[in-house]
């Protein structure tokens, strides 16, 4: 137990001596940074027992502030003294800080140089090329031009004035088109006269006359009907009705043949 306590005391003494020597020999840089979407905008490496800034993220908080530079050794971030911190401990510290928090940063300058291997891999660090999310504000002239474009793209047909093809998937939702069969055929019937006749050029061609489609009844059916209707008729009347029935049957057959010929030409 005594050996362990002695070692810890010796380490603390060495660290305090190092702090004293560093503070006396190097310049202390102090600034305030606001945590943004890219954090503090720093690429930090572990150089021995210290956390050193190797690069600044383009358009990050540190790059926009312009005070911290690559090569600075971090002393404190906020109220936490980060001298002797590992990268894992430093990451845990930053994870508990929310966006928008203003932190006071202290660092030593000119104390340690960045290792050469880190200077050569600047283009390989993806954090230095983060895209900066931004939402451009639309000015009034831009809005007026968009309104004019919308009016120019409106459909001239009054029947389809509520339908417009989508210009962009992101800006204009697709609208359901109006039923073409309902709209187009609806007003066409009101404006056009339909011709009906036997001529081929007519819209509706009649192949048979309605009067000729009435077939004569069967002679047997006519005889039965006559028997039921007139039970007390004379023999001469029955003979005339039966002869009329046969004559109607012959007339129906002739008309049926004429109808077939007309349908061929139609």
UniProtKB/Swiss-Prot annotation:
InterPro entries to which the protein is assigned, alphabetical: PDZ (IPR001478), PDZ_sf (IPR036034), PDZD9 (IPR039179)
SUPFAM superfamilies given in the database record: PDZ domain-like (SSF50156)
Disulfide bonds: none
Highest taxon of source: Eukaryota
Regions annotated as coiled coil: none
Gene3D superfamilies: 2.30.42.10
UniProt cross-references to Pfam families, sorted A to Z: PDZ
Record-linked SMART domains: PDZ
PDZ domain: residues covered: 27-109
UniProt xrefs under PROSITE patterns: PDZ
PANTHER family: PDZ DOMAIN-CONTAINING PROTEIN 9 (PTHR22698:SF1)
Stated name of the protein: PDZ domain-containing protein 9
Lineage of the species this protein comes from: Eukaryota, Metazoa, Chordata, Craniata, Vertebrata
């Amino acid at each position: 137990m005594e050996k362990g306590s002695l070692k810890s005391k010796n380490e603390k003494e060495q660290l305090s001596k190092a702090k004293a020597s560093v503070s006396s020999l190097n310049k202390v840089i102090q600034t305030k940074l606001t945590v943004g979407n890219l954090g503090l905008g720093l690429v930090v490496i572990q150089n021995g027992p210290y956390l050193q800034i190797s690069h600044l993220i383009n358009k990050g908080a540190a790059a926009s502030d312009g005070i911290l530079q690559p090569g600075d050794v971090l002393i404190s971030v906020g109220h936490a003294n980060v001298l002797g911190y590992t990268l894992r401990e430093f990451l845990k510290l930053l994870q508990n800080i929310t966006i928008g928090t203003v932190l006071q940063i202290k660092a030593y300058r000119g104390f340690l140089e960045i290792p050469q291997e880190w200077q050569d891999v600047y283009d390989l660090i993806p954090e230095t090329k983060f895209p900066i999310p931004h939402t451009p504000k639309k000015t009034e002239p831009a809005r007026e031009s968009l309104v004019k474009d919308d009016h120019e793209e409106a459909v001239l047909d009054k029947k389809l004035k509520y339908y417009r093809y989508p210009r962009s998937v992101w800006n204009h939702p697709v609208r359901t088109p109006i039923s073409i069969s309902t709209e187009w055929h609806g007003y066409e019937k009101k404006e056009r006269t339909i011709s009906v006749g036997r001529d081929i050029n007519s819209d509706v061609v009649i192949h048979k006359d309605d009067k000729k489609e009435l077939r004569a009844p069967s002679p047997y059916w006519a005889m039965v009907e006559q028997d039921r209707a007139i039970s007390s008729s004379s023999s001469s009347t029955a003979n005339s009705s039966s002869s009329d029935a046969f004559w109607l049957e012959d007339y129906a057959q002739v008309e049926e043949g004429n109808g077939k010929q007309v349908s061929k030409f139609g």
